[in-house]
Amino acid sequence: MVDIREWVKTFSAAMEEAFGDRLLFTGLQGSYGRGEATEDSDIDTVVILDHLDAADIKTYEQVIDRLDRRELVCGFLSGRQELLNWEPSDLFQFYYDTIPVMGNIDEILSLIDLEAIERAAKSGACNIYHACVHNMLYEKSLDILKGLYKAATFVIRAVSFTDTGEYTSDLISLAEEVCLQDRNIIYTFSKLREGRPADFEGIDVYKRQALWDACPTGATERIP
């Protein structure tokens, strides 16, 4: 697996060399940032420049093409003003799931009010509900189901934040803070990450239906 501490140091140094004073922020998101990475995990980077144009995107591409494990590099590239104009409900997860490497993005905190967090939770739950029904009827995909359970953990984090005022990244700690229904979703996601059943139908029907049931009775009702 990637030595992520050394990798992000190399990444940030390469970005500073390419963009100089225009580089405002570098960070790490995703499973590596949360300590949940596996051998196949993407490296989700964040880079914020003073502004972003097509030439900058090309420069960024040339830089990451020279890095080790290029095939794993994913993430977010933006200009400062574009980030400030972003939908606040999206900024909630963006801010709290990002580990700063160079600089900070604290100026977006003022945009993330309670209404934005509630909107993030409710829209996330609605999207999961729709996708669960679609998957059960048509796709019958284990990969989609695993992705929906992963998405649900972020909805649970948002709901928990509205209750406690604190963001809990670690899933084990999060499971200890939430209701039984949400805890079961977290545990099921953890189990799905550990081993893959032969096919979609091989999964206990409870695991398929529990996530679907949790959406209307969970965040969509608990968040006004």
Task: Give the positions of each predicted feature.
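Metal-dependent nucleotidyltransferase catalytic core
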Residues: 1-18, 34-39, 46-88
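Conserved nucleotidyltransferase catalytic core and NTase-mimicking acidic/glycine-rich helix/loop elements
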Residues: 9, 110-224
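Secondary-structure boundary/capping signal
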Residues: 23, 53, 71-72, 167, ...
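Short gly/ser-rich loop at a beta-strand->alpha-helix junction or flexible surface loop bordering the NTP-binding
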Residues: 23-32
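Alpha-helix C-terminal capping segments
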Residues: 66-67, 98, 134-136
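A general structural signal for short secondary-structure boundary/capping elements
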Residues: 73-76, 89-96, 122-123, 194-195, ...
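Hydrophobic, well-structured mid-protein blocks that either form specific transmembrane helices
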Residues: 86-127
